[in-house]
A protein has these predicted regions:
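Extracellular/periplasmic, surface-exposed regions of secreted and cell-surface proteins
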Residues: 63, 98, 104-113, 118-123, ...
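Conserved small-residue
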Residues: 1-46, 297, 411, 519-634
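Transmembrane beta-barrel wall of Gram-negative outer-membrane proteins
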Residues: 54-129, 140, 145-150, 193-198
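Extracytoplasmic gating/loop element in the C-terminal half of outer-membrane beta-barrel translocons
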Residues: 38-43, 53, 233-236, 355, ...
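A generic structural motif
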Residues: 86-90, 354-356, 518, 636-638, ...
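Glycine-rich, aromatic-lined ligand/substrate-binding cores of catalytic
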Residues: 635-668
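Residues embedded in well-ordered regular secondary structure
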Residues: 1-93, 130-133, 161-170, 181-186, ...
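Asp/Glu-centered strand-loop micro-motifs enriched in Gly/Pro and often flanked by an aromatic residue
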Residues: 53-57, 181-190, 320-322, 620, ...
């Protein structure tokens, strides 16, 4: 997305759109437009032509350092590491700094007893604009405010002053939307501490039997503080301040803590019987987890001095809020592995999970699974193929189920509230105001586990001493009792009904992997690829007729179709010629007659003119309206995913490249900043739209004519705004060199390697947004990184 940065062009384009919607031109001073154009960038402070993308994003240098040590004796071993990370971010005031450490210790106290401890943690600090919504200075808000500016605004002068409007005819709301000013209008810090510890005892009282018990604890503490930074926005043509953010100031403090406890006991037994022909590997265990969180937030207004970073530095009203939550999980599980001569493999699993998120009668879910594999390459009748290069040939069959309890901690319970959108539920009693409560959500005692049942049939193969390897799998994955919101009958009043286990979704497809590895002298290389195809279908919802459709904008959930399919009008063409316009008149002439009167076929969206979109009459009733919508795409979930991993080494030189992509995914994306032929006074306009728009005399336009943003004629939900999310990314290219050992030993090093890499540098896609992986979100895309590093081993 590249915005129009020539301000003279921008003003004329805005005028064009408003006039074509029958509205007055916002920029009436034609002399100023010509004055701006004539300057041609000679005086960038007085006559700016700003590209907000270039001004907002910057290159930065990030650091990541890790030192690790390991050692010990025959009975005691340790590993420790220390790390430091510093990333200043690609936007101002969005930096991140992190210190981390790890210590693992393992001790053989007795021949039958091992004790181990693993402790890790980090301390991080984040600049406030990376997260806070105070003063509109979050990263995501940067895009929102940057879109609501114009190229006629200086973002920041060389002397550090921020720009506002340089043209009084610009929209006044643009004056306070300078994204650089927004990023720097908040001060504070986000400080986070995380400590994880795990203590393990392993007993081996007799051969083949192992008993392991562990206890884990994680502690997270996040402290946030924010206060405003008062800044001014300047009109550099007249050298006056036209904007200041000195509104009602506030200071905020937040503290949130999380405690997570986990403990488990697992017994394992392994043996071989009947002359080692029968192998038995059994496991039985239990685990328990508890999560607890609480937070507190306080805000106070009217700061005496913004340099005072404490709540008592403000003298106005104060507000405070807090919340807490907890959930727990208990599991019992077992597994038995059997093999006969390591040719026939059988595995049986059973687990029972209990979740505190469900009521007692629905708390436990049982999830069994089993798999069988047959190693054909070990059969005698395969000797001929083994002689011809067959190394591995395994057939696999499995069936199993898993549970999902990803619901709110208290969704099974009734919810009471003291207010709703219409106000508080207080009432008068004896001339006094009493606090009132009303039921906001009905309880659902039947809420229970969402279950996924999966069948898999596969084959593994290897040829030529496993230089060529591959797998082929067919999977059938059905998720039942999916939690959805169903409409509430009017008898429930204002109370909403809870989520219910009412839907089923089927995913089925194939997964393929293929790899080749070889060595020719000092040259080694490998090529590994993967491919996945998935078909998605809602198999149970609210019925197959249109009354069972749930709408979410352009996306729908409809039984018998892919989840989040796009349900849209189909665009026939952009009306650009007299022949195109004749089709409009033909529909008017042939319109149906109802009660003796000819129906206006375009009443729903307006009669299209040259430069407008013409939609298709899908149901052939002679009328263009919302009844002409149909499913035009299976939605944003990709049908195809693929990847390729290349590795090569020659003596001390090593090379690696990772490619990844997807296809068969589409989104409905209509964004005035990116791909809509709409103009709005004080807002940006995409250059691609401006260059591709229709205007009188043009017959090869790729976008409709410009219209004022509230004019909906060319903004109906249609497949014109359906974007393909297919892409191929070269995720990483790395080249390294390891010095010969004879050189590193001279400087007391065991190994010394230099490397450089390019990360997220190459993306091939037709998607017009920032990044097909984040779809239509105008948010922080994946950054391109150039990395240089050194690996040292002593």
């Amino acid at each position: 997305m590249d915005p129009v940065s020539n301000y003279a062009d921008y003003m004329e384009l805005i005028n064009e759109g408003y006039e074509q919607s029958g509205m007055a031109k916002p920029f009436k001073d034609q002399a100023l437009i010509e004055e701006w154009r004539a300057d041609a960038g000679k005086n960038p402070l007085k006559y700016p032509n700003t590209n907000w993308l270039e001004e907002t994003f910057k290159s930065s240098v990030a650091h990541n350092h890790v030192i690790s040590m390991n050692g010990g004796s025959e009975k005691i071993k340790f590993y420790s590491s220390f790390g430091y990370q510093n990333n200043p971010g690609v936007m101002e005031n969005t930096g991140f700094e992190k210190y981390n450490a790890r210590l693992n210790v393992s001790a053989d106290v007795k021949k039958w007893l091992n004790l181990a401890a693993q402790v890790s943690g980090y301390v991080s600090n984040m600049d406030p604009a990376a997260k806070y919504q105070s003063e509109g200075s979050t990263v995501s808000d940067v895009f929102k405010f940057a879109s609501a500016t114009t190229p006629g605004m200086v973002f920041r002068a060389p002397d550090g002053r921020y720009g506002a409007m340089n043209n009084s005819e610009d929209s006044s709301q643009s004056a306070n939307n300078n994204p650089l000013l927004r990023l720097n209008s908040v001060d504070g810090n986000i400080h986070k501490t995380n400590v994880r510890s795990r203590f393990i005892a392993t007993l081996k009282p007799f051969k083949g039997f192992t008993l392991t018990g562990s206890y884990s604890y994680e502690f997270v503490d996040e402290e946030r503080s924010s206060k405003p930074v008062f800044l001014e926005g300047w009109d550099f043509r007249n050298e006056i301040v036209t904007f200041t953010n000195k509104k009602k100031s506030s200071i905020m403090n937040y503290d949130g803590k999380i405690d997570r406890f986990f403990n488990d006991v697992v017994a394992r037994y392994e043996t071989r019987l009947i002359n080692d022909a029968l192998g038995i590997n059994a496991m039985l265990g239990a685990s328990q987890e508890k999560y607890r969180s609480h937070n507190f937030k306080a805000t106070k207004y009217d700061m005496i001095d913004t340099s005072l970073g404490v709540l008592n530095g403000a003298i106005g009203d104060a507000s405070a809020s807090g919340s807490s939550a907890e959930w727990a999980m208990r599991s019992f599980f077992g597994r038995v592995n059997l093999d006969w001569q390591q040719k026939y493999l059988l595995e049986i699993n059973l687990r029972a999970d209990q979740s505190s998120r469900f009521l007692k009668s629905k708390r436990t879910g049982y999830f069994p699974s089993a798999s069988f594999a047959w190693r054909l390459e070990q059969e005698k009748f395969m000797e001929g193929l083994r002689d011809k290069g067959l190394s591995t040939l395994k057939l696999r069959l499995s069936y199993g189920s898993l549970g999902n309890n990803a619901v709110g901690n208290y969704d099974a319970l009734a919810l009471y509230a003291n207010k709703n959108d219409d106000g508080a539920f207080n009432y008068s009693l004896n001339n006094l105001v009493a606090l009132g409560l009303a039921q906001a959500r009905i309880a659902n005692p039947n809420l229970t586990w969402e279950s996924t049942y999966m069948t898999n049939v596969g084959i593994d193969f290897g040829l030529f001493n496993n230089r060529l390897t591959g797998t082929m799998d067919y999977f059938h994955k059905k998720t039942k009792d999916i939690l959805i919101n169903l409409p509430a009958p009017a008898v429930h009043g204002i109370a909403s009904i809870p989520k219910q286990n009412s839907a089923e979704v089927l995913n089925q497809g194939v997964e393929l992997t293929l790899g080749w590895q070889d060595k020719i002298g000092d040259f080694s290389y490998s090529v590994n690829g993967n491919f996945t195809y998935v078909k998605n279908e809602v198999t149970k919802y609210k019925g197959k007729d249109k009354g069972g459709i749930t709408y979410s904008g352009a996306n729908i959930i409809w039984e018998g179709h892919a989840i989040n399919s796009q349900y849209l009008l189909r665009c026939d063409r952009i009306i650009q010629t007299d022949e195109d316009l004749a089709l409009v008149q033909q529909m008017i002439d042939n319109a149906p007659v109802v009660d003796g009167k000819k129906v206006d076929p375009f009443a729903a969206f307006g009669t299209p003119q040259k430069g407008d979109l013409l939609y298709k009459d899908i149901n052939q009733d002679g009328i263009i309206d919302m009844d002409d919508r149909e499913i035009v795409s299976d939605g944003p979930n990709p049908k195809f995913q693929f990847g390729l991993n290349l590795n090569a080494s020659y003596k001390g030189i090593d090379f690696a490249m990772l490619l990844q992509g997807q296809a068969g995914a589409k989104i409905y994306w209509q964004n005035d900043l990116a791909n809509t032929p709409s103009v709005r006074h004080g807002y940006q306009l995409n250059k691609e739209v401006a260059d591709g728009r229709w205007y009188e005399g043009r017959t090869d336009a790729t976008y409709p004519r410009l219209l004022e943003y509230q004019d909906q004629r060319n903004k109906q939900m249609s497949d014109f705004y359906l974007e393909n999310l297919a892409y191929l990314k070269i995720r990483n290219i790395q080249l390294g060199y390891t010095l010969p050992a004879k050189l590193t030993k001279k400087i007391s090093l065991e190994r010394l390697r230099f490397y450089g890499s390019l990360e997220n540098f190459f993306t091939f896609t037709s998607f017009r947004g920032f990044d097909p992986e984040i779809g239509g979100n105008i948010d922080y895309p994946a950054m391109k990184n150039v990395v240089f590093g050194i690996n040292l081993s002593f």
